[in-house]
Amino acid sequence: MRWITRPGWPGNLLALAAGASTLLALAPFDIWPLALLSIAVLYLGLRELTPRQAMWRGWCFGFGLYGAGTWWIYVSMNTYGGASPLLAIVLLLAFFAALAWFFALPTWLWARWLRRNEAPLADALCFAALWLLQEAFRGWFLTGFPWLYAGYSQLDGPLAGLAPLGGVWLISFTLALSAALLCNLHRLRARPSFLAVAGVLLLAPWLLGMALKGHAWTKPAGDPLKVAAIQGNVEQEVKWDPAHIDAQLALYRDMTFTSKPVDLLIWPETAVPVLKDQAQGYIDVMGRFAAERHSALITGVPVREVVHHQRRYYNGITVTGEGDGTYLKQKLVPFGEYVPLQDMLRGAIEFFNLPMSDFARGPEDQPLLQAKGYQIAPYICYEVVYPEFAASLAARSDLLLTISNDTWFGTSIGPLQHLQMAQMRALEAGRWMIRATNNGITALIDPFGRITTQIPQFQQAVLYGEVVPMQQLTPYLQWRSWPLAILCVLLLGWALLAGRIAKTV
């Protein structure tokens, strides 16, 4: 097994396979031990490499992770973006190759400045700190792509109880630390005191996670609310076709008129496929219907505003009936809602000129939505995958709501991964999450991240259920990731500036 730690393609191919295997730790497969194993394989493989060799090994790991975990983007490019199969594959490989640098650069940094082979305990701690910072960095750089975090593997695993303490990143940190410690236990046998410390660091988080799993950090703020989420299952090919707009509006109107009386009526992202000011008459009619039923209707709708004599378009969500508020999406999907380097790319191929791909970013510090006397934190599609952003809204809310249109990804696993991240947000916040989508998966999620009810994908249907407004804050909503970030910076600073001290550990 020495070839694992040595340079060369055998080790690089193993790193590629380890990255790819992470997919199986996440939804819909949920074989969570593979997340631990894949990190351990990468960690072991960096032990004897030069910085340049470590960089390429990390790149192989990242390419495997994104290649296996986000292949479903091909559906958007080919089926809906107009790219030929060959062009879609080329673009996708370039995308994977670029994202792989999120792992290549940290592994270079690790081998160049931070690795302490002679100090296994310090080595494991610093590796976990660097792992956390790379996850945070890829959720921030160039607006971020916070997909495939290792911590999501634990939604139903032993570490789930840590999510309300420190979010998905605390779980990722624990997985990386555990993987590195397991790889180093045999090297600590000659030093019983340090072996004991390693044992505590290894076991304590897992025992704590299991002990806190199911612990209620929040409590009800009122009586249960009845919910109806409308899943229209509108085909993406006709979504923005002017010839089909009236039919879509009639579909949601009729499904709502025939639905059971509830407190909250939820329509998915851009259920109203015309600008809000153009559809205001229709929205008012639906609002009066909702008010007569003592309901609030919440729907996705694009919004047009004039700012400094310039028109701006937003992906929005609005409330009518017994509620109020309009929210404008802040976290936009690259190429789907805006085109990076648009002067160069816009119009080059159909994929860079998708309908409604010129949205502006909504302002920060927007008020939450109000419905039935409660504050609702809104997340439009992609926004729910950002842990810190989601927490900033959840801390002011009684309920969480995410609306989405995952039709772009066909029958792939992309929507299942998306749902898993929404479940983690509910667990982190200790709040109920309503998830309404165009074609699935529409679901209600309880404060422990469990799906209480859902309806099948690819069907026109109405989901009925109850949610409970919640009050009080989980530790994660109070402190976010600041304590963990400070710990990681201190650990890495110690490794950089006090290498001699690390050698004695």
Where are these regions (language model features)?
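Short glycine/proline- and acidic residue-enriched helix-loop micro-motifs
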Residues: 89-96, 234-240, 351
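Alpha-helix C-cap/termination motif
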Residues: 116, 188, 258-259, 292, ...
